[in-house]
């Protein structure tokens, strides 16, 4: 039943704003986009101004919808649609424009089809009839102070108040009356937000919660949070879980986090991952499940990062550590580790150098790029000297350093004495990890890191004060941390594809038909190359990423190659030649 919009528009609006299912929300947006197209073709669509108003909100960014919907933010289209909505007679668009910085330009002000107060009256009537969006718009008028310039809103605010002259006299002697009136305005906003939420507008719970935060009313804030979580808003699911966690209700907290994780909320993904990875988070009431933890950490690493979640570096590193240490004996996927190490969120972290040194030195999910490996070993060594320890990754860079000395990559000639020194340091680091009970997972048990260092040390013997290979051995070897036989050679992985792609992360080889199929629907493709990295002599070496971008003409595109320059001193600088 519709109270303000036409039935057709109301149905589409409900799909976007009355629930938090991404597929249904996009279906509603597509229906409104189709009405806009018909309008542009000259067909008469009842209530078309309101269609433009709704889409203007959708294109204004995730803070105006719900972030997990994944709607594209387009300020140009948002302003254009809002202006069109106003010109086509949408009263609610006028109230929206009052809340949108720079939307009511002098030109638009002159073209208003009605006064702002008349727009308020129309929307207020819709709110009284039960329209969720009208109630939300009316609440905004009072919550954000727009009632000051709207006579009809002032009348609502002043209902039951003494005359302005009496209020003036009272104001000369006390601030209490002003505070009482401010509380009344907040109560009016809360009343309409409550009606909006109860009528189905899930995002109304966000604003309603804010009003209680500003009043420092923790009891009502928590009540709204649990109501919003029940209504299906992912942000409220996180907040509800956080409340339960603070109370020690860990099983209940996890239920909320998992519900939010199912809707791709980054904070819920992180919290659920923490529960499954680290028994200490729940006082060991939730059993450790490394596979679930990894799944949630890795999804959090690529979850939307606007407003609610910006912890991508942390969750990415947690996934890297878990996969590298292989705690459950089935998580070590070097292709995935190499992929995670390419994530932009961790580029500035010193903690990545031991992992990069190891994967480049031993070709773990990457090309055997020894120059890059040496650079990573050097950076890891400097950070080790600065900070003292990497905790769970010392052995990785020490093994890489030992191997680089063993094959003469650093000193031009093999230096087995230095190699053995670093292998011995690595053995000490591994032994330390395997004997501590206070690991960061909180299991109370030592880790079981494979002793690759001891296996490599078996290749050497001390002769006349220097190390040399034992008879019949030409290089150290290990059975630890093997690459699986099925690991795809010449593999390319789709790192990220914009515009609602469902490809996600994979460690499979992608053929040309797959790329062509994605190219038909996407504007932007970014590939990470795990091995078989190619070079263009005197231009770029070890190309590790290819980015393809096109505008509307799919027969032409820009291709960006990311790799390293020839000069070893510049090998950490990325070049961006366009072909």
Give the residues covered by each predicted segment:
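Structural register within alpha-helical repeat arrays
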Residues: 15, 55, 97, 138, ...
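Short coil/turn linking the two alpha-helices of tandem helical-hairpin repeats
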Residues: 20-23, 56, 60-72, 98-112, ...
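Short helix-capping/linker turns of helical repeat alpha-solenoids
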Residues: 23-24, 39-49, 61-63, 67-68, ...
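TPR/TPR-like (Sel1-like) alpha-helical repeat modules
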Residues: 295-301, 378, 416-434
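Contiguous, well-ordered beta-strand patches that form the walls/edges
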Residues: 473-482, 487, 493-571
